[in-house]
Amino acid sequence: EAYLNLITFRGELQGIAAVSRGLFDKDPSGLGEAESLLLASLIPSSRSTAEAVARRAARLAERTGSASGAEEIAALAAEVLGRPYRVRPQVALAPHVARMLLAGGEVRRAQCTLDGELQAFVQEALNRQLAQLAERNVRDGAALVVDNATGEILAYAANQGITSSAPHVDGIRAPRQAGSTLKPFLYGLAIEKRFLTAASILEDAPLQIPAEGGLYVPENYDREFLGPVSLRTALSASLNIPAVRTLMLVTPEAFVERLRALGMESLDREADYYGYSLALGSADVTLYELVNAYRTLASGGRWGRLKIDAGGAAENTVPVMDRRAALIVSSILSDREARSATFGLENPLATRYWTAVKTGTSKDMRDNWCVGYSERYTVGVWVGNFPGEPMWNVSGMSGAAPVWLDIMNHLHRRTASRAPGAVAGIVSRPVSFRDSLEPPRTEWFIEGTEPPGEIAVEKRHAAARILYPQPATVITLDPDIPAELQRVSFVGRFAGDTHEWRLDGLALGSSAVLAWKPERGRHVLTLVDRDNRVADAVGFVVK
């Protein structure tokens, strides 16, 4: 067998399989009787003339009692040996999956969960989009499809791109900057903690946050500001400033903890390392991690490991987020009208069946993402360049989203998808906004968080300010005074309304002047009104 696999035929064709594909354009298992005789007759002397090979094959046919006649064999020899051979490229359907299943060097027959037809479709959809984006400096892409109920991986296209400079990189496992794909989990955490509701008003206005080495000044994708918007609009339209304000409420520490609970092991630094830019996806994550996190949203907040080995045991799931918050986030991500504030009504995220989806674009357009789910499937797509080169004017909406839509439409060509129903502890209430801030609508709330009446943005809200400490203040403890006796006064201007002090996300009190026992480290102090809106925030340091 080893000899047959190593023997050279007619130049650079080595082995029975190679010569079979080169001469007959098929694998050895698919050869007919006359073709097999001819191939066997090449072994003694592959460089013989077609006539000599045909004579050997005819003698072999006679000895073996073959039905193939000498004339048939001679005609076949003249045809296949008288023309240049051509070996078509053999495209592996899922080489990265094969390497995963055979990891450790064990040679075995392994069954995987992939759907072969779907895998081929996903690869073709990616190749088609990458060909269209080639003129915009886009060479690489990856896509992952999983079953929500079982966690089985149905398609694993880890590296698509004919012009890829890194064809062996697994794009599904490679960490890349997350962009806006983390926002659903941030808002979900704020809703779960009852800091905010889907109808809470957030300011989409210029923001400066003291940070080490200067000020952190986030901007929106289009560098414009919408003013007061609801959380539903802020998430659907992927606004950056409201997301940063929400992280100031939740705290980076709590958000990092939540992301790790969702399986994002790529976040291996302390929360201080990421800071408030984490709201905008400054951290690196993998497509594998993102898809499973979105699958958790689709599964009502329950997380479990994905499965590729068909022979492996089913994974148990564990609750990592409030089921009610997951449902509210799913409702927002499926809201076509709310999304239109940034993307318009007609875009690649609009489907004729129920889906919830989010795009993301990293800094300088080095990566873009589209991750979303239906009732049955979760699909994630990444488009970019493995070396990290920027794309030219390609966002998640124009890069990854069309592939996501193609895959979802293929999955649901004969399968319906319905929105999740209400669960215990969640209520649906009509809401209206004063001054036509947003159109009236019916909104989901965790029971007990629904607003008592019309939602308004009060002018006096803008006047509330933190007077002390000022941004970037450095407070030094007095070594001559016992630490337990030292106090710092937080001073605020409340402008006639009730406000609450929060330090690093923890409630302190609601008096205009509040005494606090200082603790060494960096802190963020926020002033929040009775509707959980952030009126002001400052960062300071205690040494």
Model-predicted segments: where are they?
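Non-catalytic, structured segments within soluble enzyme domains
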Residues: E1-A120, E257-D272, Y276-G281, R295
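Glycine-rich, acidic and aromatic/proline-enriched surface loops and short helix-turn segments
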Residues: N5-E12, E35-L37, S41-L42, R99, ...
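Soluble non-cytosolic domains of exported or imported proteins
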Residues: R10-Q14, G30-A34, S48-R55, R88, ...
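Acidic/histidine-enriched alpha-helical segments
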Residues: A54-A57, S66-R83, V138-V146, L202-Q208, ...
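Soluble, non-transmembrane domains of envelope/secretory-pathway proteins that act on or interact
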Residues: E72-Q90, P206, P210, E224, ...
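Conserved catalytic neighborhood of penicillin-recognizing serine enzymes
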Residues: R86, A92, H96-R99, A149, ...
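A penicillin-recognizing enzyme superfamily signal
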Residues: C112-E135, D147, Y156-A158, T163-A174, ...
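Short active-site loop at a secondary-structure junction
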Residues: R136-G141, S164-F185, K193, T197-A205, ...
